[in-house]
């Protein structure tokens, strides 16, 4: 348990003053709760003396005491708001830290955690009651306040009547037994609930991402059935948690009421026998009533802690996942004059898939087509060249420098990458092209024109808004925005992963014509399944079953390589 509190307390360090302020409000709140019954105890026991003629000073002091207690209660009223503020701040910082750590991960991480699961961990696990944000401040400080009230109230009650205090606390051992019996079962149910939530998010994410396929195959009923089964399972788990919590709270309330009835009955006898005063009985009853909330709050801390700790484990699981290997290269490129593969290869962990044995040297300016059947390692090869995947064997050199020795930031400056799926964001076309690089409008417009998507053809120019995933424009326009993003930085190395697949023949031809007309020294690697695209290239890298089969011009390979001809005939359009 201590490891969780150490993890939480590190967020307190950035809010020391606010934490001290909360501690002060906690003390004020507990003190006010303690003082109020004592003032009325005094009033009940001394009402005749206070109201008697000539006792104006005593009456004035009593009014001042009541005023002070009232003012203190007003100050203590800021307590929930102060807790809520720190809840929000901690939630924001935890999410920011987790998101920053996620951005440092590599392919191993994203093959293990799906988008829906990650979204759940960064939202529900952090901000939903009673998860990390609420528990880190409100949960802990409420427990501290309740513990303070418990200690203070019990102290005063023992001072007034130790015997009556002992009798009123008879239900306490039963409460502890209930907590012990339910604590482990509740923790197990909470973990099951979090996993069910992540599974639901994953299903929704994959459904919305592939909605076109689902509609095309009329698979709506199948997806609805999967969701219904997941929700039924999740509902059963959540109901079991709710039942456990209801049983705990109900039993605690009943036992608390038993204690109050005991005080009224036995306390009345004590008053009749002059063992305590009527003011003592009033104060005693109020203190016991005040104890009921702490006696629920403190066990509730353990209940909510199970849920919060499960969420902390889930957030820490993604934060503590090993990051991508540190690339400590510092060498600069400036431009890209050549790329050389030296028996380069990459194998995905736990399987033989990937690409191996790639050897060849390519000099700028040149267009290189990467060709092969589905699953031959084409996309893997360009991801290796972009630095997304490390070479597990051999090496890749840029300008004669091993890729691992190149400054990663410098490599990104000279590289333009277009993935198979045009990943666009819910923002304007201009911001999608800039991608935080602070480019002038003229630079963005030039890149769009080069991708054959002039800004003037868009409804609102650069400010044209795109929906989720680039919705609102055609598939060809989305791909051209992605190409413009890659070209906007004037890269010397362009990596196009089947990016012309969504373009018709005329659009693709205009793209290549525009790149040639612009001139400049560019080394372009383009993964393609189109023979028309291959014809635009100077050289072809032909991969077959994950191994380099041949390198040559399209005409040479057609003439000399039977496997190439077969793949061209069966896999390419």
Regions found by a protein language model. Name each.
Residues 14, 18-31, 61, 65, ...:
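Transmembrane helices of ABC transporter permease
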Residues 196, 219, 243, 291-318:
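Cytosolic ends of transmembrane helices, especially the final helix of ABC transmembrane type-1 domains
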Residues 88, 96-126, 202-226, 317-328, ...:
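Short intracellular "coupling" helices and adjacent cytoplasmic loop segments at the cytosolic face
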Residues 4, 12, 79, 83-84, ...:
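Juxtamembrane loop-to-helix connectors within ABC transporter transmembrane domains
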Residues 334-573:
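ABC-type nucleotide-binding domain
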Residues 65-76, 172-180, 245-259, 278-300:
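Hydrophobic alpha-helical segments in the permease module
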Residues 10-17, 107-108, 124-140, 185-202, ...:
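An intracellular "coupling" helix at the cytosolic face of ABC transporter transmembrane type-1 domains
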Residues 1-33, 48-66, 79-83, 87, ...:
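Membrane-integrated ABC transporters
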């Amino acid at each position: 348990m201590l490891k969780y509190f150490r993890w939480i307390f590190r967020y307190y360090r950035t809010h020391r003053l606010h934490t001290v302020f909360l501690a002060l409000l906690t003390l004020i709140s507990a003190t006010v709760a303690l003082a109020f019954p004592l003032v009325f105890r005094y009033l009940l026991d001394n009402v005749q003396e206070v109201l008697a003629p000539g006792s104006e000073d005593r009456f004035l002091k009593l009014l001042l005491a009541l005023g002070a207690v009232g003012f203190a209660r007003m100050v203590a009223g800021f307590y929930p708001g102060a807790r809520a503020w720190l809840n929000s701040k901690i939630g924001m910082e935890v999410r920011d830290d987790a998101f920053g750590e996620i951005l440092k991960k590599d392919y191993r991480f994203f093959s293990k955690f799906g988008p829906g699961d990650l979204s759940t961990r960064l939202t529900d696990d952090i901000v939903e009651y009673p998860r990390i944000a609420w528990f880190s401040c409100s949960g802990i400080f409420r427990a501290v306040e309740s513990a303070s009230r418990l200690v203070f109230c019990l102290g005063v009650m023992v001072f007034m009547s130790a015997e009556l205090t002992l009798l009123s606390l008879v239900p306490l051992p039963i409460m502890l037994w209930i907590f012990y019996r339910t604590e482990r079962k509740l923790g197990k149910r909470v973990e099951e609930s979090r996993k069910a939530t992540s599974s639901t998010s994953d299903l929704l994410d994959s459904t919305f991402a592939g909605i076109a396929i689902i509609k095309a195959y009329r698979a709506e009923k199948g997806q609805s059935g999967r969701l219904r089964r997941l929700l039924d399972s999740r509902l059963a788990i959540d109901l079991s948690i709710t039942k456990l919590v209801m049983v705990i709270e109900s039993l605690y309330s009943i036992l608390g009421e038993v204690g109050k009835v005991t005080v009224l009955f036995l306390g009345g006898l004590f008053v009749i026998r002059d063992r305590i005063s009527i003011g003592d009985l009033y104060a005693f009853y109020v203190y016991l009533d005040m104890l009921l909330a702490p006696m629920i709050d403190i066990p509730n801390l353990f209940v909510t802690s199970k849920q919060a700790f499960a969420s902390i484990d889930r957030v820490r699981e993604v934060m503590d996942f090993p990051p991508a290997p540190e690339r400590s290269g510092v060498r600069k490129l400036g431009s890209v004059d050549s790329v050389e593969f030296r028996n380069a290869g990459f194998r995905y962990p736990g399987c033989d898939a990937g690409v191996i044995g790639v050897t060849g040297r390519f000099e700028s300016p040149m267009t290189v087509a990467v060709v092969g059947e589905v699953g031959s390692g084409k996309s893997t090869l360009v991801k290796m060249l972009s630095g997304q995947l490390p070479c597990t064997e051999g090496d890749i050199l840029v300008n004669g420098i091993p890729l691992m020795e190149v400054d990663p930031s410098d490599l990104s400056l000279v590289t333009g990458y277009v993935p198979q799926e045009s990943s666009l964001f819910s923002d304007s076309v201009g911001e999608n092209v800039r991608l935080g690089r602070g480019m002038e409008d003229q630079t963005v417009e030039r890149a769009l024109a080069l991708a054959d998507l002039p800004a003037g053809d868009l409804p609102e120019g650069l400010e044209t808004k795109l929906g989720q995933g680039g919705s609102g424009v055609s598939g060809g326009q989305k791909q051209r925005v992605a190409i413009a993003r890659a070209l906007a930085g004037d890269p010397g190395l362009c990596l196009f992963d089947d990016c012309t697949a969504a373009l018709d023949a005329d659009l693709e031809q205009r793209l290549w014509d525009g790149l040639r007309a612009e001139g400049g020294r560019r080394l372009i690697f383009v993964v393609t399944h189109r023979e028309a695209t291959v014809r635009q290239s100077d050289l072809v890298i032909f991969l077959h079953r994950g191994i380099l089969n041949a390198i040559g011009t399209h005409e040479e390979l057609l003439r000399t390589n039977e496997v190439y001809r077969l793949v061209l005939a069966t896999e390419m359009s």
